[in-house]
Amino acid sequence: IRINSLNIDFTDKVVLDIGCNAGGILFNIQDKVKYGLGVDYDYKIINFANKVAKTEKYNNLDFYTVDLNSDNFSVINNYSDQEQKFDVIFLLAVCMWIDTWEELIEWTRKNCEVCVFETNGKPKQQDKQLAKLQQVYNSVELINDNSADDDFYLRNDIQGAKRKNHPLRKLYICR
């Protein structure tokens, strides 16, 4: 759902997906990108992503286990076989899980041309994430105000306390 709302040409781009889960975003654009790097803290899903990439012969994709609560962000650069900045960094619905999320947003600004960012957490958390994006990036464009990779978040029958605990996430392109 999220990738379809983007107007980004991924042809020959170097792409990083932070919090890549099982690699779905990168698998969907692997035929276009020059190189894709996915990182996530869960070694089991990274192992799965690597099995899929190997089976499908996606030689332009790599997946690594990185715990951004304990590892320095610069470790990501060590995994990339590219010397330049990333053209695009995906940072989708992960900030509420990272203690130093504000520093991570600053790191993305220094290491990419475009950041595709999805807010997550309670409304106040999402507001803080947006404020940080606006502080760090020159342009923050709202792409979708009900972004989700799970139809649960898009259901109209979710109201009251359930909606409060599962607020709609917002998708931004930051430059």
How would you describe each model-predicted region?
Residues 1-12:
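Conserved alpha-helix/loop element of class I SAM-dependent methyltransferases that forms part
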Residues 13-21:
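Conserved class I S-adenosyl-L-methionine
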Residues 22-33:
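Conserved SAM-binding loop of SAM-dependent methyltransferases across substrates and taxa
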Residues 42:
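Conserved SAM/SAH-binding beta-strand->alpha-helix loop
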Residues 49-50:
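Conserved SAM-binding loop
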Residues 58-69:
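Conserved SAM-binding strand-loop segment of SAM-dependent methyltransferases
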Residues 87-100:
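A short SAM/SAH-binding and catalytic strip from SAM-dependent methyltransferases
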Residues 112-123:
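Conserved beta-strand signature within the Rossmann-like core of class I S-adenosyl-L-methionine
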